[in-house]
Amino acid sequence: MTSSAPTLPDVTIRNVSRHIQMSLMGKGEPPWLCRLQLEPLLQAMEEQQLGNLEARWEVEKHGNEVSGSTSREVWEDADFICPVLKQCTNPKLNENKNIHQAKECEKSPFLSLSPHQQWKPGLPRRNDALPTSLCLCCSEN
């Protein structure tokens, strides 16, 4: 659990991505992420104006909601997710870097779009190595 929000320049897309992945590693099958762990990071990002985010987290644990997050909330800011996909190593995604192509990925990223965009959220494998790029769906160990 993060006790205090980091300050600029610690709050970056890369650091948030790595924090998310570290939170997911070693959590059981499938791993899950409580959005409350990341709220200090996201709050700092908004306060520092590092992105116009409506940041929400999808909470998955075999259909059980994590206490404190009764609604199934997801990311809705495509501009935040796009840099992740642009660094993807999957040829299908490199051909067309549109965010909607993410569903073509063999391992769907856990970041999700709005329900009407019909991108089913998934989670990285527990044993995935932390990638050097921001790509969550296509990085390989």
UniProtKB/Swiss-Prot annotation:
- Domain of life where this protein originates: Eukaryota
Q: What is this protein called?
A: Putative uncharacterized protein encoded by LINC00469
